[in-house]
Amino acid sequence: MPQPWPVASASLLRGDQHPLHRRPRCEEEDLGMPIPDSAHAVSVCLPTWADVVGYEEKDGRILAKMQTGYPRFFLHPLINQVRARLPAKAGQEVLPFASAVAARQCAAMTGGQAQQVEGLWAAYFPTEVLAVARAYWQHTGRILSSRAAEDWLTSGRLQPKDDALDQVMRERLAGWSGAPASRISLHPSGMAAIFSAFEAVTLRRQGRRNVMFGFPYTDTLKILEKFGVGVEFLPQGDQSDLERLKRLLQTESIAGIFCEFPSNPLLQVPHLPHLHALAAAHGVPVIVDDTIGTFHNVNILPHADLIATSLTKAISGEGDVMAGSLVINPSGLLADQPTPGRDSGLYAADLKVLERNSRDFPTRMRQANANAERLARFLADHPTIEEVFYPGLDPSTVYQDLQKPGGGFGAVLSFLPHQGATSTPHIFERLNLSRGISLGTHYSLVCPYVQLAHYHELDWARSCGIDPFLLRISVGSEPWPTLKERFTRALS
């Protein structure tokens, strides 16, 4: 078995010194191990195609090996320890949450009740609706973090909010985003930020549907479908869909328009200036998830009313903390609204890690941008590859119009090999990169994204133009010759 890596500060793990640069977690013996080697890792190794399928089909052999998982999809062992400590009656289950608001919402959905136990808010509900509670946990992202669970288990209390550090982090985000710190809020996860945005626009126009423009990350669409009164899904996010949206807005009052810039996993770039101008003419706010584009690369604030970002990804870069942010455009349609979601905030111990990790975000992003663009061109020229999805390969894209000076095209790309049904699993298992979910880390990650995000709806994903045999790469800051050699071997 591989030996645990020694604990080191984030600053010591930057550059080529990170253990995952030298020894990625991709061997069969790594199944279920955290990526990175941290009690609070947000990714987990699924090293073979069969492991991915087994995980999705809840194969007991695979699940027994899982030491951790992505915190919204997988209840962290520390969370389960908290659940075991919270008093529950026979026939009752419990989930701890980051705030009273989240606990009460979950309780309302499950016919249960919210209680505060030793400073910790939790929802109690009948065992038969545990799946409903887990869906709330997953989709809304208003989860209790593993660090909060650890503190409560060891000391019997949670740390108080660190207002000074919260201000430091929001001012840092303000410098990158162009919005004032007073219009930025921190959240327990990226999805929690999106859910707060959803609540804000839904409250503003109650009883109205939302629009999903372009094919999004799975849980964004689930929020609009399950928590709202309906959603108009325009999966292509192209000019034809823009025309459809124009006709829709002429006949129906819409609460909000959600999109990604670029999208996950096809890296599609919506014409955000046109989309925002159309929406503004009808008084409809536009909510943009810029997690893949990042504040470093693109300036989208003039064309968005709200920007939701998963800080878990590139801004942290280490993959050991969950966090999100929501930015309000001070000149947008929601400028006079209260900052959404300020009731939950980010747990103090997580905030400390995020602040430390994010200090070198621009430096990391520049290197990852350069590596990703080289890799995209390498793959586009390779005879085994059918298609590469990356904004930098399309010189006509609106992405360049919104690109910041010194900004790149991002660190995420997807590609489809020829004869993907047979070749993709082999390439995945030959690629000497850490094999796990998530993105934005300064060590590269590869995953069969569609299999993991849409395994039980593959035909539907295919109908939206998403091939089930795509591989998504989150490109890290390894030396380019190292990455090139690894891809050359995998594709040979």
Feature map (PLM): residue ranges:
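Short, conserved charged micro-motifs
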Residues: L242, Q419-H426, P479-E485
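C-terminal alpha-helix
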Residues: R486-A490
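Conserved PLP cofactor-binding pocket of PLP-dependent enzymes
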Residues: E429-L458
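Structural motif of enzymes handling amino- and sulfur-group chemistry
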Residues: A10-W49, G54-K58, D151-W152, T339-H426, ...
